[in-house]
Every structure is written in C-alpha cells, then in structure tokens.
Amino acid sequence: MTAIVDIIGREILDSRGNPTVEVDVVLEDGSVGRAAVPSGASTGAHEAVELRDGDKARYLGKGVQKAVEAVNGELFDALGGMDAEQQVQIDQTMIELDGTPNKGRIGANAILGVSLAAAKAAAASYDMPLYRYVGGTSARTLPVPMMNIVNGGVHADNPIDFQEFMIMPVGAPTFADALRCGSEIFHTLKGELKKAGHNTNVGDEGGFAPNLPSADAALDFVMAAIGKAGYKAGGDVMLALDCAATEFFKDGSYVYGGENKTRSRSEQAKYLADLVARYPIVSIEDGMSEDDMDGWKELTDLIGSKCQLVGDDLFVTNVTRLADGIKNGRANSILIKVNQIGTLTETLAAVEMAHKAGYTAVMSHRSGETEDSTIADLAVATNCGQIKTGSLARADRTAKYNQLLRIEQELGAHAHYAGKAALKALR
C-alpha cells in the first residue's frame, strides 16, 4: 500500500523569485506527499550543496533543471517500489547514490525534496498529520517563535551589521497568544519607525530594514515597541539576535562596516556579553564566525551559562560538526535547517544528538522560502520548543505560523506551549 509508484519533480519559484525544487511522491494507495525546498542567503561554507544549473541565459544561472532531472530520473529509478515508511532506507539510498560527502552530485535540493515528500506521503497514507507520523504520540509541544522583526546584514540594505533582531514571546500561555503578542509588537514597531521617519518596507523574512546606525539603536526601537504594545520586555517578551558573524569576519577580526569599527575575537565576545547585560537577550545565533573555534569557546565560557548560543553556520545541522562542538564546549544550541544537511533522517539525528547532550535545538526556515509548512510540523514532532520562521508579514512566513495554530487547535487540551521552559536561562 505504501510502495512508491511515482516521483515527480518540478521547478517552482521561492519567495525571492528564484527557482527551487518541488517534489511529489505518489504511493500505491494513491496517497501523495508534496514538499518544496527552501534556499538560504547567508549560507555556511560547510552546508550540503544546493545544485544550480549555472546557465546564465536562464534564471541568471539559478535554474534547478538538473536537480529536477535527477528527481525524475536517477532518484525515481533507485526508489521506485520502495516502501515510503522506510525513511532511513530511502534517505540512505539517496546518500549512497549521490556518493559525495556534501550531496554535490545530485544536489541536496533534489534529495531533500524527495526525502520530505516521501515522509508526507507515508503520513497521508495513514491519514495522520506529519507531526504525529514523525513524532509519535509524545509530539505535543508548540514552539516559542523567534520573530525576526528588524533585519540587517545580508538580509537588508542598511548599515546594521547584525542580520536579525528577534522577539520571543515566552510569557504567553499558548502559541496563539504568543503569535498575537508578536503581531501587536510588529505593528507597533512599524508605527514607531514611521513616526521617526524610517522606511517600513520589509526584507526577505518580513522584518523591517530601517536605516539605523547600530545594534543598540535597533534594540532600543524593539524595546520601545514591546512596551508601547502593552508587554513587558524581560518578562512577557525576551530578545534574540542572529549576528551572522561569518559574514563580517575578515582576516581574523570582526569588521563592522556599518559602525566603522573592528573588533578582535575577545572584543567581539565582550561586546556580545555587554549587550546581554544591558538588554533582555536570551539567545544569540552565530555570534562568532563558523571557523573561529577559539572565539566560540571564549564566547561560550563567557556567557554560555546565561544565554543560549546557537550554532548555525558553525554546525550546519551536521552531526559530525555538532559532536565536535559538544566535545569542545562550543555553543549550547543548534539551529536546525533541513536543507543544510539534505535529508529528514539526518535532520532528526542532529536534533536527537543535541537533546542528548543537553543542547537546545531551534527549528528554522531559510530566507528563500515557499508556502511549504513542513518545518512547523517538524518543530512539534521533535518537541524542540523553539522555531525561527521570520516575521509577521509575507505569506511564506505566516504559512508556518498558521500551520502551528492548526496543530495547537487539533491537539486541544494535549497541546503544551513551551514558553520559558524552552530556554535554559529562564527555567
């Protein structure tokens, strides 16, 4: 009944208007699973490879026809007739077929599309929601959203060097209340920025990209919006940063082009510690560059006991890199991006390894997204307690939030909003 009878790949557009891969997996009983693959802007050097065509005459070289051909040809030939319930076997077959350490031959975008679509098809065959199929009966934790309401770095055309300034409504009793809190702060911030003469257009992830001179200026605006919306910063709502420090790490130093400042490794760690002391910041992602291992250790030793330090470019959802980080005391949390590693099996393995080591895990979108809401289900399936999926604008972002609302309603009295328990510093 759950044998794979067809795999159909196609080229669609992501939220930036660039091509990406979408896959349908069709089973013997007629069940269909569909998955669309996201794409990042600030990508780690150690990520699995997203295969692009490179033909400048078509989509400026960003086409994905080669990946789609692999889905319809090589991958279907290898997986046709296989049982969609055998997720590990499906993913392992594709990894072995690709034959490279980074999925660079077939493309992680092709492999991931098939991996996720197969899981969704199997769930559909059982008439089960994906979160229940993947997570079992214990999947009931609704994640705290990290809402990216001010953008800088490569996500915006402004002087702010840090990539994301986020709010976390940890004090809400339910996910629905957390979402309402975030929305009210988002709209209040828009009014405050407008009043101060700033542009209120939104960036790739739906956050505002005002022309502000520094991280402090951005944080001050966010703090003011939280208060004006009727919430308490440091109680109802905490702050989070994504520094994306790899993007401004040059020749061993952190070069803040917007602020016209250069900081050494130690100065970078102390600067972040100072921000944590002055603002209710409970999570910092990529505070150090992906290959600045000494910097990561220094930062973790300095503030790891009071702040979640999330490795994104550092770990790239890769268990080998995560194991090394755990062993050497770098960071205390991992960002989980399905397309960084390229299969559902490897994604779940990274979450499991993190949890066993006492690290937290944050399920995450990419800046180039689609209407696909798979990561919402995966956040609940893994009980990871945190999700990062952009701001309160753009349908590619709200699709994930809306799916979480549906899941919370479906779970009813069994639903549990992670709240402050999601963060070790607040327990």
From Swiss-Prot:
It holds the Pfam family Enolase_N. Its main location: cytoplasm. Its EC number is 4.2.1.11. Keywords: Cytoplasm, Glycolysis, Lyase, Magnesium, Metal-binding, Secreted. GO terms for biological process: glycolytic process. Signal peptide: none annotated. It is found in: Cytoplasm; Secreted; Cell surface. PROSITE patterns: ENOLASE. The active site is at E205, K337. It catalyses: (2R)-2-phosphoglycerate = phosphoenolpyruvate + H2O. Belongs to the enolase family. This is Enolase. It comes from Rhodopseudomonas palustris (strain ATCC BAA-98 / CGA009). The gene is eno.
